[in-house]
Amino acid sequence: MSNRTFQRGDPIGHAFADPGLLAQALRHRSAGTPHNERLEFLGDGIVNLLIAEALYQRWPKADEGALTRARAELVREGALAVIGRTLNLGERLTLGPGELKSGGHRRDSILADAVEAIVAAIYLDCGFERCRAVVLPWFEPSLAALPVGKAEKDPKTRLQEWLQARQLPLPQYALISESGDEHAKQFHVACILEQPAARAEGQGTSRRLAEQQAAATVIAQLDSNT
């Protein structure tokens, strides 16, 4: 399965000045060299730095333990694989015949590695500031949905308390779809408010995470209208 050059408007959000970096980031070792393992190594460090910085800035009251747990949740293999699917990386990966036949383009580990490799490719292509600007939006739904320690309430709790304070009906959460293999489930959920009328959708590797993401989006809608 060969990669396609990303164009403007594609989910990744970056047009590469050096297409060779993109090609390498999407080439699994089963397809020969140069493959993406060195880029994956570099990207792992960059992702950890970006997420650590984002959490440090966004949750000033959270202690070290809460920040560490939050970062671990955001950069774990399953979470990165969800991003890989959102970016449609599976259909762009270059895999050897064996990996292709065994469904490697759907495997969490391969997708997560490709995400890290692409982060490194963006960094090498255009530097850290641009890399941050491109990559952080990939994590934004999960950042917004993640409860960080006792200092921060999760989006579902915040939304419920906002509605209760105004004596308004509580939100309803509806499962839109559930897809993927047992080891790579993807849940698609809607959060629906009766009053004020609002609706948002969220996706995640568990129904809880999908509901948190949907609630976070509804909160953002309410904030923009006040």
UniProtKB/Swiss-Prot annotation:
* Annotated SUPFAM superfamilies: dsRNA-binding domain-like, RNase III domain-like
Q: What is its EC number?
A: 3.1.26.3
- Oligomeric form and interacting partners: Homodimer.
Q: Can you say where in the cell this protein is located?
A: Cytoplasm
Q: Which residues bind Mg(2+)?
A: E40, D113, E116
Which BP terms in the Gene Ontology apply to this protein?
Answer: mRNA processing; regulation of gene expression; RNA processing; rRNA processing; tRNA processing
Name of the top EC class for this enzyme: hydrolase
UniProt domain DRBM: residue ranges: 154-224
Q: Which reaction does it catalyse?
A: Endonucleolytic cleavage to 5'-phosphomonoester
Report the protein's function: Digests double-stranded RNA. Involved in the processing of primary rRNA transcript to yield the immediate precursors to the large and small rRNAs (23S and 16S). Processes some mRNAs, and tRNAs when they are encoded in the rRNA operon. Processes pre-crRNA and tracrRNA of type II CRISPR loci if present in the organism.
What name goes with this protein? Ribonuclease 3
Protein keywords: Cytoplasm, Endonuclease, Hydrolase, Magnesium, Metal-binding, mRNA processing, Nuclease, RNA-binding, rRNA processing, rRNA-binding, tRNA processing
By which gene is this protein encoded?
A: rnc
What residue stretches are annotated with the RNase III domain?
Answer: 5-127
- Output the InterPro entries linked to this UniProt entry: dsRBD_dom, RNase_III, RNase_III_dom, RNase_III_sf
Names of the cofactor(s):
Mg(2+)
CC annotations in GO: cytosol
Chief location: cytoplasm
Q: Which family does it belong to?
A: Belongs to the ribonuclease III family.
Provide the GO MF annotations for this entry: double-stranded RNA binding; metal ion binding; ribonuclease III activity; rRNA binding
Q: Which domain of life is it from?
A: Bacteria
What CDD domains does UniProt report for this protein, alphabetically? DSRM_RNAse_III_family, RIBOc
- Active-site annotation: D44, E116
